[in-house]
Amino acid sequence: MSNNNNKDDSELQSRTHYYNPDRTAIPVKDDVDQLDKFGSPKLSANDHSFTNTDSVTSEDRPFSSPVSTLTSNSANFSDSSLQNSPVHPIPSPALSPTLNLGSRPDVKRVSSGGYFALPKQLTSIRQTHRPMSQQHRVPSFHPASDTAPPSPIPFHHHLRKKGSSMSIPGQTSIVSSNNGSEATNPPEEKLAIIMVGLPARGKSYIVNKLVRYYNWLQYNCKAFNVGNFRRKHASHSHDDASFFDPSNEEASKLRESFAMDTLDALLQWFEEEDGVVGIFDATNSTSKRRKAIVDHLSKVPYVTTLFIESICNDEQLIAANMRMKLVGPDYKDLNPEQSLRDFQERVRMYERKYEPLGKSEEDLNLRYIKVINVGKKVVAFNIRGFLAGQAVFFLLNFNLSPRQIWVTRHGESVDNVRGRIGGNAELTPLGRQFSEDLALFIDEKRDEFQERLYNDYSKESHLLQHGSHSFNGKQFETSFNCLTPSENTVNDPQVLDPEDEERLEKPYSVWTSMMQRSIQTAAYFDEEQYDIKAMRMLNEICSGICDGLTYEEIKSIYPKEYEARKLDKLNYRYPGSGGESYLDVIYRLQSVIVEIERMKHHVLVIGHRVITRIIIAYFLGCRREDIAYLNVPLHTVYCIEPQPYGTDFYQYNYDPNTRKFSRVPFSL
């Protein structure tokens, strides 16, 4: 029994604890000079000797208590005040669960259940009763050395770092802690997108779509095409297939030089023109080239790199892309048959050394996206960052299916006649007439487009059987792999299947806002033939306290607001509950734009002035300074047809006297 007691005493003696005051302590006025800059008592070699050994683990301190564990048998006090301090060996609760020290002033109980002695020198620190926070954890110290360390630096002074998160134009801002004011928050992240892929695989198509999307979201985005740089700086305008032969060392060095010069131009644009997303458009077909690009970009710490590879194994898509190349800058005004053979040879040169994205990039922990057959399959690896995530999101939601996108404003409303903004007015008689004729007009155009699809299908079936086609009006024979269906059918290869002709019958959607004037404009569409849906995202911009006023009334009642709007219409936000800016509406419409890109069928959007401006600005790729000033009058209908080479636009004006829509030159 006595042996057990001695054993317990030994264990108890080896587990002696001391209390080190927390950082929430409030010093007595006379003792301020005895504290260091972190509020801790100043310690010197003459006070005591502590060594930070952190012998207590996080499991020993379940509530992050400021526990300082000290082995008493190695203590070496030189200061008499500390030597005379009552040091009480206190066992842990597991050794003495019934121990009770009452209210002794020199002992403090902590949340883990143990007790700690207060050295006399520290009793002048008046303790607060607030619980210790995680930020004020104190390291453990052991009197196991002859040299006293400096006062321990709190945990947060070691590891606290400024975070970096998404910056959205018009939606995020920097708040100053000094006066609570807000400032614009330019994106800290800059994204360099590096394209990868063989020629005629749709890289430039993806590039153009991404440039338009990022710029529409108000991120400054620009593409840098190595081919354009080569044509601009080469000694002659056309390089035949031999220039792309990997065994041609002189040409290979020249191509590498063009690539690095183009990359330098991208970095210069980042630095000098506040670029946010730069796209490096080239084949970048080998791991060696891609590694050189990463090494080059790594010199700039604020740039994130994302590779996007475009893969296409659909012969019809490749054929269509090849035909587009034959009318491009490398083969313009040249013999089409000879140009086709040269381009095919160029592709074979690249195929000899082509290395797809994969293990080599994964071993380097690089970010990449593989887009297969224009978005039918998308593979993403190690995607991090808001801007890179936007690219993945967008590439998952676009296609090349032939379709029509119609955009118009609602018919004339009562508030339009009165000149009042906002509100929820009904249509005038003229507005209802426009609505009725609009339904008939869309019916007519729907039938015309359907007939065009059938005609194209018949023509392509004939070409597939006879193996001939024409370029620039010249007829020549082609092999099956080089057959080039028309833009309309090749974009959706499934329409070429004779057993699946029902795909030629395109469904149709009609979208309105939640406001009466928009819903009433769709009233004459047959619900059996059109999917009619009202969307709150399509509501007109909310004008806050200016809702229901004319512009003259705003100028008179709120002159400062009137002038502020004139100075910066895109960024100006109407004051008052729910007031919005153009940038607010852009992000409200983001899901609408992505859904339009995703859909393979027709849609008519019946919106409002700001809504129509923003949607058309997206498809046109308008500059940010032009978006808020596009001319989109009432009773004008816009038709948008996505194509592999871009977008076709048509404009139709309504004549209320003849009740007809006539096509006019597109203008905004």
Curated annotation (Swiss-Prot):
Q: Which Gene3D superfamilies match?
A: P-loop containing nucleotide triphosphate hydrolases, Phosphoglycerate mutase-like
Pfam families from the xrefs? Answer: 6PF2K, His_Phos_1
Q: Which GO terms describe its molecular function?
A: 6-phosphofructo-2-kinase activity; ATP binding
Catalysis: reaction(s): beta-D-fructose 6-phosphate + ATP = beta-D-fructose 2,6-bisphosphate + ADP + H(+)
Broad enzyme group: transferase
Quote the record's binding site residues for beta-D-fructose 6-phosphate.
346
Does the keyword rRNA-binding belong to this entry?
no
What are the EC numbers?
2.7.1.105
What ranges does the record list as Basic and acidic residues composition bias? 1-14
SMART domains under this entry? PGAM
Role: Synthesis of fructose 2,6-bisphosphate.
Q: Supply the name of the protein.
A: Probable 6-phosphofructo-2-kinase PB17E12.14c
Naturally occurring in which organism (per UniProt) = Schizosaccharomyces pombe (strain 972 / ATCC 24843) (Fission yeast)
Record lineage: Eukaryota, Fungi, Dikarya, Ascomycota, Taphrinomycotina
